[in-house]
Design a protein with these regions (language model features):
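Conserved class I S-adenosyl-L-methionine
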Residues: 1-38
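Class I SAM-dependent methyltransferase SAM/SAH-binding core
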Residues: 41, 49-94
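Conserved glycine-rich SAM-binding loop
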Residues: 46
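A short acidic, Gly/Pro-enriched loop at the edge of an enzyme's catalytic core
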Residues: 96-103
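Residues lining the SAM
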Residues: 107-109
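SAM-dependent methyltransferase
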Residues: 118, 138-211
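A short glycine-rich, Lys/Arg-flanked "PGG" loop and its adjoining helix->strand segment in the class I
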Residues: 121-133
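C-terminal lobe and adjacent flexible extensions of AdoMet/dcAdoMet transferase-like proteins
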Residues: 205-252
Length: 252
C-alpha cells in the first residue's frame, strides 16, 4: 500500500513517540556495542523525523521508504530545517543502494509491515548485501504478544486538535493484524472522512534471529523497547542488534 492518506496524519498521530529520546537511545546503543555510525541508512524512514534527529547529531544518514507520500513529507520537513538529506523511494525487500553502508536502522515496527515471511528474509539479505563487514543492523518490531493481546481485535480512538481517528484491528491467522483507519477532520463546521487500510504481522524472536543468521548477521542482543535489559514476557516491542559477520548472499 502507498500510505497516501496515512502520510497526511502520520506526524500528528506519532507526536508522542519522542524522536529525540529515541535518537539518544540509538546513539547510546551504538556506543554500548562499540560501533561508529559511519554511513547510515534509515530503512523505512517514513516522514523522516528520526532521520533528521540523527542528522542533527552529526550522523551521515539518508532515508529510504516505499511511500512517495511519506517521502514528500520528509523532504519538506528536512528542507524547512535546512538539512540536506537524501531520500530514496524503494521497498525494503528490493533494496538497491549506490554504495555500501556501515549502519542500518529500521524503527517503529516497519518490519512488521512486511507480512510475507520470505519478503522479510529478502529484506535482511538486501541489507546484508550492502553492509560493510562488522556493520550493525538495528531494528525493532512489535511483538507477537502485542499483536495477540493488545492489538488483537480491538478498536482504539485517537483525538488531537487536528484530527479524530478510529483505529480498528482484525487479528487473522499467522499473527497478521488487519488495520483499518478512519480519519475525521473538521473544516468550517463540516467533518470530512478519509480511510486507510494496511496489515502488520508479528514475528517471533526465534524466527527473526534465524532470518538474520541466514542473511549473514550475528545477533548481538535483543532488548526491550528503549531499554538495555532482557525483554519481559509482556514486552510490546523488541529491539534487535545484529552485526555483519558472514556475508553469504552476495548474489541476491
Amino acid at each position: 500500500m502507498s500510505y497516501n492518506i496515512f502520510a497526511d496524519y502520520y506526524d500528528v498521530l506519532m507526536q508522542n513517540v519522542g524522536y529525540k529520546e529515541r535518537s539518544d537511545y540509538i546513539c547510546e546503543l551504538m556506543k554500548r556495542h562499540n560501533h561508529e555510525f559511519g554511513i547510515t541508512l534509515d530503512l523505512a524512514c517514513g516522514t523522516g523525523s528520526l532521520t533528521m534527529e540523527l542528522a542533527q547529531k552529526g550522523v551521515d544518514i539518508y532515508g529510504i521508504d516505499a511511500s512517495a507520500e511519506m517521502l514528500s513529507e520528509a523532504m519538506q520537513k528536512s528542507s524547512e530545517k535546512g538539512l540536506n538529506i537524501l531520500y530514496l523511494r524503494q521497498k525494503m525487500q528490493s533494496l538497491n543502494l549506490y554504495g555500501t553502508i556501515d549502519t542500518c536502522i529500521c524503527t517503529l515496527d516497519s518490519i512488521n509491515h512486511i507480512t510475507n515471511e520470505k519478503d522479510v528474509a529478502k529484506a535482511f539479505e538486501r541489507v546484508a548485501f550492502f553492509m560493510n563487514q562488522d556493520g550493525v543492523f538495528m531494528f525493532d518490531v512489535n511483538t507477537v504478544y502485542k499483536h495477540e493481546q493488545v492489538l488483537a481485535n480491538n478498536t482504539f480512538v485517537y483525538e488531537t486538535d487536528k484530527v479524530f481517528c478510529v483505529w480498528q484491528n482484525t487479528l487473522r491467522e499467522n499473527c497478521v493484524t488487519d488495520i483499518d483507519l478512519d480519519f475525521f477532520e473538521e473544516e468550517n463546521g463540516i467533518y470530512y472522512r478519509t480511510s486507510e487500510s494496511f496489515s502488520e504481522r508479528g514475528y517471533s524472536r526465534e524466527k527473526l534471529t534465524e532470518m538474520l543468521v541466514n542473511a549473514g548477521f550475528e545477533l548481538e542482543a535483543v532488548y526491550g523497547d528503549m531499554s538495555f535489559d532482557e525483554p519481559k514476557a509482556d514486552e510490546q516491542r523488541l529491539v534487535f542488534v545484529a552485526r555483519m559477520k558472514n556475508p553469504i548472499n552476495k548474489e541476491c
